[in-house]
Amino acid sequence: MSTLRVLHEKSELGKTTVYPKEYTPHLLLPIPRDLNRKTLNVNVSEPPPFYGYDLWNAYELSWLNEKGKPFAARGEFIIPATSSHLIESKSFKLYLNSFNNERFADAAAVSQTMKRDLSKRVNESVTVNFILHETEIPVAYSPKGSLLDVLDIAIDTYSPDPNLLSTSQETVTETLYSHLLKSNCPVTGQPDWGSIEIHYTGPKIDHAQLLKYIISYRNHEEFHEACVERFFMDILRHCRPQELTVQARYTRRGGLDINPYRSTNPTFSVQNHRSFRQ
């Protein structure tokens, strides 16, 4: 069954939204990661050829204490890339809204409930953190590499084409980034805007061709997580780096932003540095 068919049958995407009035964990819609990975010719009977996570920031998160007083926080959810499923975004939004009128003893009780529900849906332990005070919010992050967007290019390809990628014989270690990433929701067609950062060691990637490849996603319809995995696999296969990390930070929609990270390095650390567009 295709990802689109699963979503059309089960998701609230593209439908009139009815917001829950009480805690409703069954709203969460898990989507098998294998559905997309098969299209990338990834052997789904083995562990994926990368490590990483999907980091979600939730900006519209609230609940009641036992006296009925509302509390608010920013939520941070870290779902391992090795989990069997991802969570469909609108179902996640509705699930979080189901906490709005629910009473809890404290923030820890809320986060523990969310951790239990999410971990059950994706079949792996999910990390849940709450940012409760302004002093905990990180400052905007600027990548330390080369910005590709300053390059003057001509392009008329707006669907992913890995054949655009090319390398030279020189071996380098460098970080490249772009704010021109755009793809689209595969169900609603809504645009997904983001920034992408690529760090690698290997044959030097032609910068102009890499920018063209990034822009080629402009009319592509695929989820955030799937786009980043497609980036990773295309660069890995066509450019053959010894080390590779690809991460994207998408702008928010419906009070959520999604930030997938994929790497050949198994000893990565989770970094939640918000971009200036977030």
From Swiss-Prot:
BP term (GO), one: tRNA modification
The keyword Transmembrane is annotated on this UniProt entry: no
Compositionally biased region (Polar residues): 261-278
Pfam families: QueF, QueF_N
Catalysed conversion reaction: 7-aminomethyl-7-carbaguanine + 2 NADP(+) = 7-cyano-7-deazaguanine + 2 NADPH + 3 H(+)
Gene Ontology MF terms: preQ1 synthase activity
Key word Oxidoreductase present: yes
Alphabetical UniProt keywords: Cytoplasm, NADP, Oxidoreductase, Queuosine biosynthesis
EC number(s) per entry: 1.7.1.13
GO CC annotation: cytoplasm
Protein's pathway: tRNA modification; tRNA-queuosine biosynthesis
Primary localization class, coarse: cytoplasm
Leader sequence segment: none
Family of the protein in this entry: Belongs to the GTP cyclohydrolase I family. QueF type 2 subfamily.
Role played: Catalyzes the NADPH-dependent reduction of 7-cyano-7-deazaguanine (preQ0) to 7-aminomethyl-7-deazaguanine (preQ1).
Name of the protein in question: NADPH-dependent 7-cyano-7-deazaguanine reductase
Organism: Coxiella burnetii (strain CbuK_Q154) (Coxiella burnetii (strain Q154))
